[in-house]
Design a protein with these regions (language model features):
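Hydrophobic core residues within well-ordered beta-strands of beta-rich domains
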Residues: 1-3, 148
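Asparagine-centered strand-capping/turn motif at beta-strand->loop junctions
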Residues: 5-11, 156
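A contiguous, surface-exposed recognition patch within enzymatic or periplasmic domains that forms
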Residues: 10-18, 22-147
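Short amphipathic alpha-helical leader/targeting segments
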Residues: 19, 159-160
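Short, hydrophobic/aromatic-enriched beta-strand segments in well-ordered soluble domains
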Residues: 145-159
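Short, compositionally biased
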Residues: 162-164
Length: 164
């Protein structure tokens, strides 16, 4: 399945914008976002990527799992405290596991582009109702009547093998 997002500048003047595509997931699952490859301190002293926090994000919230390979956020219908992070996701994918099903969303990353929200091309949000996997395209200036087209490949849900 493929979803195509199109934005058209209907103004009489140019605008700067970034496409922002939300995949709204059912309650009760968890989002899985890949970490950048781990490298020992002796091999790499430079930062790997930005981690952007919103003012209501609580990194001690038990719905978060901060692992070596993945960052995970669990959706809990009994917890009404919203959580959100943004990352520069160079692998270009995020997944949602609900029971035995795994939904994978893929999106591009352009290392030469500027991204909104301190350089994020991927954000995840949850509250007591849903979890969102958000993909952001690069910031760009669009002339009147110009169309921005961003394709997002969505892989058919499949059986998962418990990502850890």
């Amino acid at each position: 399945m493929q979803v195509v997002h199109r934005l058209t500048n209907q103004n009489l003047w140019p605008v700067e914008l970034a496409p922002w595509a939300l995949s709204v997931m059912a309650a009760g699952g968890r989002c899985i976002v890949p970490q950048e490859p781990f490298r020992p301190h002796t091999e790499d002293l430079l930062p790997a990527r930005p981690l952007v926090l919103w003012s209501y994000t609580d990194m001690a919230d038990p719905r978060w799992t901060w692992g070596t390979k993945y960052v995970q956020l669990r959706q809990d219908p009994f917890n009404n405290k919203p959580q959100k992070i943004g990352v520069r996701n160079t692998p270009g994918w995020a997944a949602y596991q609900l029971g035995e099903d795994l939904f994978i969303k893929t999106f591009p990353f352009d290392p030469s582009a500027r991204y909104a929200d301190f350089g994020c091309n991927n954000e995840i949000f949850t509250n007591e109702v849903i979890l969102e996997i958000e993909s952001l395209g690069p910031l760009a200036r669009f002339a009147p009547r110009r169309v921005c087209c961003a394709c997002r490949k969505l892989v058919t849900p499949q059986k998962s093998d418990r990502c850890r």
